[in-house]
Amino acid sequence: MCYKFYNIMVIKSLQTLVSESLKEIKTINADEAFQMVQDKNCNLIDIRESNELENTGKVEGASHIPRGMLEVYLDPNSPIFQNSQIDQNKEFILFCAGGVRSALAVKSLKDMGYQKVSHIDGGFGSIASSKFKII
């Protein structure tokens, strides 16, 4: 008897990836993030693309690491590790435009071994309507 095995590729949707990530990561709101920034207990990291910052403004006090470079910049073995820009002893709070990319990014950082990471629900949209200053 001969058996044929077929490789069937299963593609997960973006919504599935985000839903799975949200079950494993810490989500905070903009007011909680603002208080942590005021208390100097975190690294606020904007993972939006440069053109997004140019179009909508920057969040005062946030470091900018584009989503596409996040793992490279935060890999201690990378030649462009951003150790001087980021305090490794403080929580990383990530945000993007709406919260999708930051949820996936936080999951990725957790997979890399980072423990104190969270993202802001609603991203820049919720930040812009909070106490944060947009410059």
Task: List the model feature ranges, each with a label.
Residues 95:
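Short, surface-exposed ligand- or partner-binding patches at beta-edge/loop junctions that are enriched
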